[in-house]
């Protein structure tokens, strides 16, 4: 168990160190890019200033050369007889002088280019050394502050964890309240429906009771009417029988009131 814990802790430290080293390398690369851009801009501005100075010096040199040629050009020479001498020697001297000046100018331009190349090499070497020095200083500073950076990272991780836990608890509490509110709403709805059904059931029971009472009343009325009809029939039957008896009595009474017939036999002689 101890070995596994030490291995996991070493792996976590190694992963953290690798992450820090990657971050440091990215920051160093970004700082190097910015430094290169700044130096390239400064070199470009210096070159532009040199070109402007060279162009001004060239224009000044050409102007001064023309002035010198005008001042150095000898007057037209004549012989003892007043004839103009040939200008070939003067032209040759002028061409020779121009060639010498051109050589001097070319040498000057070569020296300027050589100086620019040397300055550029010096600037590049200086920039490289400065960059290496800055990277070394940054590496040393990061190495010195490694423990502090790790503690800060752990602190921020713990703080982010606490914030996430708090947000999660708040979200769970909101969900719980929402579920309770929904459950209460469902219970209220079910209670309302139940009360409505009970009300409907009571109303139906009342209607059924009223209908049953009315039906019982109707049945009693029908029974009473049937009893009355039966009594009426019995009464009519009794009256009919009574009348029939009276009629029979009358018929029988009439028979009794007739003269009696005598059926006597005479004596034979």
UniProtKB/Swiss-Prot annotation:
| Keyword line | Chromosome, mRNA processing, mRNA splicing, Nucleus, RNA-binding
Q: Where is this region: Necessary and sufficient for transcriptional regulation?
A: 71-269
Q: Name one GO cellular component term.
A: nucleoplasm
Q: Which GO terms are recorded in the biological process aspect for this UniProt protein?
A: mRNA processing; regulation of alternative mRNA splicing, via spliceosome; RNA splicing
Stated role:
Dual function regulator of gene expression; regulator of transcription and modulator of alternative splicing. General coactivator of nuclear receptor-induced gene expression.
Please state which protein family the record places this protein in: Belongs to the ARGLU1 family.
Q: What is this protein called?
A: Arginine and glutamate-rich protein 1-B
- What is the phylogenetic placement of the source species in the record? Eukaryota, Metazoa, Chordata, Craniata, Vertebrata
């Amino acid at each position: 168990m101890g070995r596994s814990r030490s291995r996991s802790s070493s792996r976590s430290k190694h992963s953290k160190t690798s992450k820090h080293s990657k971050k440091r390398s990215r920051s160093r690369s970004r700082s190097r890019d910015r430094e290169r851009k700044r130096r390239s801009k400064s070199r470009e501005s210096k070159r532009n200033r040199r070109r402007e100075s060279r162009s001004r010096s060239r224009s000044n040199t050409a102007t001064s050369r023309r002035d010198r040629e005008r001042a150095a050009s000898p007057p037209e020479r004549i012989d003892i007889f007043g004839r103009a001498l040939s200008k070939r020697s003067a032209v040759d001297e002028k061409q020779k002088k121009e060639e010498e000046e051109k050589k001097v100018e070319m040498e000057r331009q070569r020296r300027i280019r050589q100086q620019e190349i040397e300055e550029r090499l010096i600037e590049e070497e200086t920039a490289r050394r400065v960059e290496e020095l800055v990277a070394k200083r940054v590496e040393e500073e990061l190495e010195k502050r490694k423990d502090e950076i790790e503690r800060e990272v752990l602190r921020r991780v713990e703080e982010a964890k606490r914030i996430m836990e708090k947000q999660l608890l708040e979200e769970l509490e909101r969900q719980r309240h929402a579920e309770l509110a929904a459950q209460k709403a469902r219970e209220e709805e079910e209670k309302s429906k139940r009360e409505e059904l009970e009300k409907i059931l009571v109303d139906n029971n009342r209607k059924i009771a009223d209908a049953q009472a009315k039906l019982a009343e109707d049945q009693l009325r029908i029974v009473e009417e049937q009893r009355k009809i039966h009594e009426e029939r019995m009464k009519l039957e009794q009256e009919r029988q009574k009348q029939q008896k009276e009629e029979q009595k009358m018929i029988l009474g009439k028979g009794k009131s007739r003269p009696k017939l005598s059926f006597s036999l005479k004596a034979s002689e």
